[in-house]
Regions:
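Aromatic-lined carbohydrate-recognition surfaces of secreted/lumenal glycan-active proteins
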Residues: 16, 70-88, 143-150, 186-195
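Active-site groove signature of glycoside hydrolases
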Residues: 34-59, 87-88, 147-149
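N-terminal carbohydrate-binding/catalytic regions of secreted carbohydrate-active enzymes
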Residues: 1-20, 24-27
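Distinct, well-ordered alpha-helical segments
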Residues: 2-5, 25-36, 57-67, 83-99
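Substrate-binding cleft of secreted/luminal carbohydrate-active enzymes
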Residues: 145-157, 161-195
Length: 195
């Protein structure tokens, strides 16, 4: 990916997919380091693991070891990406990274939030949730840049509480999110995939 992205002037946040297999993790780490050093003009940020604490593939200490290995061998800013609450549960990991990457996925939260739900003051509940979570993490880690590494809404699937998946809902979610992001100055990625 970095080679092709560079050809078109695109920047990449390159990640290593970690799991509970040390051999596979070392292969991923070595590939990440190789690409980060080989494509310095394209690889803008480096992500060591995605939601491994959520999935319980690694402990925080095991993850810390991998982050340190990468930080010693690349020049780009290094982070770990997970659902926001896992950063709050493992705050010492912040000492290992250059910035905090959180995932805010209101449809997939333990308590899903529908797009049309409103607060008593009329504000959209989902917008309040996005801003509140961002600010909660920012307050916990005031000396770290906070990046939203994943946000989005599913186009299909089952209802979760009053959270309905769908293409129209995706557009609505992104419109709400983008408005909050512009007002609050979020640095973010949007999840988008295709078959």
């Amino acid at each position: 990916v970095p080679q092709r992205a560079g050809k078109y002037g695109l920047k990449v946040w390159h990640g290593a997919w970690l799991n509970d297999n040390d051999k596979e993790n070392l292969e991923q780490i070595n590939l990440l380091i190789d690409h980060a050093n080989k494509y310095k003009d394209t690889v803008e940020r480096v992500i060591v693991g995605n939601e491994v604490l959520l999935r319980k593939d690694l402990t925080a200490n095991e993850l810390r070891r991998y982050i340190r290995q990468v930080k010693q061998r690349v020049t780009q800013p290094v982070t770990y990406a997970d659902v926001w609450e896992f950063w709050l549960r493992n705050p010492s990991l912040a000492d290992e990274v250059d910035f905090i990457t959180i995932h805010i996925l209101p449809y997939w939260e333990d308590e899903p939030i529908g797009l049309d739900r409103r607060e008593a003051d009329g504000q959209l509940s989902i917008e309040k949730h996005l801003v509140d979570i961002y600010k909660k993490v920012q307050a916990r880690f005031p000396d770290k840049k906070i990046v939203i590494g994943e946000t989005g809404w599913p186009s299909d699937g089952r209802m979760r509480s009053d959270a309905r998946p769908g293409r129209v809902e995706q557009v609505k979610y992104f419109s709400i999110f983008r408005g909050a992001a512009e007002r609050e100055g979020f640095d973010y990625n949007v999840i988008e995939a295709f078959d």
